[in-house]
Amino acid sequence: MLRPIEVSTLDPITPADQPAPMLDWVPVAKIVIDDDFQRPLNRNNWDAIKRIAADFQWSRFAPVLLAPIEGGLYSCIDGQHRAHAAAICGFERVPAMITIVSKAEQARAFVHVNSTQIRATAPQVLRAAIAAKEPWAIQCRDAVEAAGCKLMVFNKSTADKKAGEVFAVQLVRALVLGGKAWAVTAGLSALRAYDDQDRAALYSDYVLGPWLTAVAQDTAHAQHDLVAVLRGKNPYTVIELADRIAKIEGKPLAVTRRNAFVALIRNAGRVAA
């Protein structure tokens, strides 16, 4: 059965005023990748490119999305993997949809395409969002940097991670969008003061998840001596004990871990009072 494009039962929507895109075959040599918002090509990316090239079919090749820039070049918004694969196969031109937009809109388009299709990692989306000056991304970056840490816009291997590097982008974003940027700054500041051995593992999701969500439970927590809380009981010990309780009582790990830190923070507040 063949169906037409039928939308007569839906209310029409008027799109934003914008120039119509152009369709063309663009020389691969004129396509460039803007590292301000595009993801870098690591080993996994190159493996994917080689797989596309090894079984290249035009029937599977969606036109790349480009924006014209100075010098007669085209910034690649979406499709750098396909473009690289075509180059490996010796094709000098690729089909493209060309849209005239600013660099900020290029970055926003990258975020939209890769967020809706779930192809980019959270750090990669953050990188593009910062380039596009998206408010949420700037707020996330600033909340982390205010604590002397760095919100990472690309992944690293475990061996290459350093103390103060925060990869928990989704956690930070959720807290910031929930009005808890203060908790991100307070929690990370305490970790930096507590960590006198530059332990990268302290800034992993394993620790940051329960710790930052615990700090965020109450604005009063920011007034407590959070450094003393961390020094009073090793964070790993807190999490391990919480996991045992969760197993015995059949409770969710995330909630039990968070509540364990909440109890320690509140107890520190009572002692200080």
Segments (PLM) and residue ranges:
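Classical N-terminal secretory signal peptides
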Residues: 1-3, 272-273
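Short alpha-helix boundary/capping and kink motifs at helix termini
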Residues: 2-77, 81-88, 92, 97-100
